[in-house]
Amino acid sequence: MTRAATSEPNSAENPFPVRAVAIRVAGWIDRLGTVWVEGQLAQVSLRPDSKTVFMVLRDPAADMSLTVTCPRDLVLNAPVKLAEGTQVVVCGKPSFYTGRGTFSLRLSEIRAVGVGELLARIERLRRLLDAEGLFDPRLKRPIPFLPNMIGLITGRASAAERDVKTVAAGRWPAVRFAVRNTAVQGPNAVAQIVEALRELDRDPEVDVIVLARGGGSVEDLLPFSDETLCRAIAACRTPVISAVGHEPDNPLCDLVADVRAATPTDAAKKVVPDTAAEQRLIDDLRRRSAQALRNWVSREQRALAQIRSRPVLAEPLRALTARAEEVHRARSAIRHDVTRLTAAETERIGHLRARLATLGPAATLARGYAVVQTVGAGGPHVLRSVGDAPAGTRLRVRVADGAVAALSEGPTDGE
């Protein structure tokens, strides 16, 4: 049998009964006293026949919630109408109900978070995100000129969805959309928008994502200044266009997104080109190109005409004719000089030939001289001494008109 309290330590052999644990937990929580809590109302259950109102207070940044209860009169006399999405600050005492084992906060005071306070918090978050570099223009991704498919996150059957799709189709009839309808205000908006954003970012066919919502109060647009949503937009690989509210509205998602559009209609104009405008541009470019080509041809024709009008091209043989006489005179002079030089050289060669004939052996032989050569095994040799022609030596005697053979009888006396 187990006991609520024992001197022995708690263990599997000595467990606490449920009532003991519940009473201890209730005691710990009861010692907390009253606490101030801020959150967003996610559910308000106000039954006509009940004096107690049950509500759920949610923390959008952490996706956590807390059950709260309060007297009916406290809700009816609240400074603002309490509804889902209302940001409030409450004072209450934590309670643990031992019978059901549930935790709740019993409220004694409810205060609405004023617009000024909301704006101040948004400004503090803006400074934080700016300091982290989430607004850096260098991180902005370019929007494709003609996206294959456009991801559109907006409220179901909303004017923003109708405006974006109608204007985009009017500008580019072949445009395609992947639409994700989500809550765009209230406690569930941030979670649904972030989920849709991540889903479209994973889709390889989606080239750009448009986040669209019409105008509204600061409270209505509060989800679009949520830190979780801003960081989800910054983490996207797909370019994001923020088209939330109207021109004066400036939620933080506008600063994180790659492109800010003043309205959903403006987003449609930014995301796809205008077919008519592009056709006009093409026609204008073709017209300007044709005119530029015609101007170029005209300039080249004028330049060619100027070149052809020059004397050297108008009468190309004129220069040759002017130089023909000069060439003729030069040719005659060359011929005269060549003839004169040829005659002089011919005469000089004749003189040299005559001198050569006079000094040569043939001229000596013609004057009656003879050349005597010995004939031997080594070939003929000119006889230079009588000692070279002993008796019996064969001789060859060359005269002017030929040669005769002779035989030496040896040296003789006398002349």
Curated annotation (Swiss-Prot):
Write the record's keywords in alphabetical order, separated by commas.
Answer: Cytoplasm, Exonuclease, Hydrolase, Nuclease
Where it sits in the cell: the answer is: Cytoplasm
Any Pfam family matching the protein = tRNA_anti_2
> A biological process (GO) annotation for this entry?
DNA catabolic process
Q: Name one GO cellular component term.
A: exodeoxyribonuclease VII complex
* Reactions the enzyme catalyzes: Exonucleolytic cleavage in either 5'- to 3'- or 3'- to 5'-direction to yield nucleoside 5'-phosphates
Gene Ontology molecular function, alphabetical: exodeoxyribonuclease VII activity; nucleic acid binding
- CDD domains, per the entry: ExoVII_LU_OBF
Which EC number(s) are documented for this chain? 3.1.11.6
Looking at its record, which EC class is this enzyme? hydrolase
Which InterPro entries does this entry report, sorted A to Z?
Exonuc_VII_L, Exonuc_VII_lsu_C, OB-fold_nuc-bd_dom
Family matches, as HAMAP family: Exonuc_7_L
Q: What does the UniProt record say this protein does?
A: Bidirectionally degrades single-stranded DNA into large acid-insoluble oligonucleotides, which are then degraded further into small acid-soluble oligonucleotides.
UniProt similarity note:
Belongs to the XseA family.
Give the NCBIfam families listed for this entry.
xseA
**Subunit and partners:** Heterooligomer composed of large and small subunits.
- What protein name is recorded for this chain? Exodeoxyribonuclease 7 large subunit
Organism (species): Mycolicibacterium paratuberculosis (strain ATCC BAA-968 / K-10) (Mycobacterium paratuberculosis)
Q: Which gene encodes it?
A: xseA
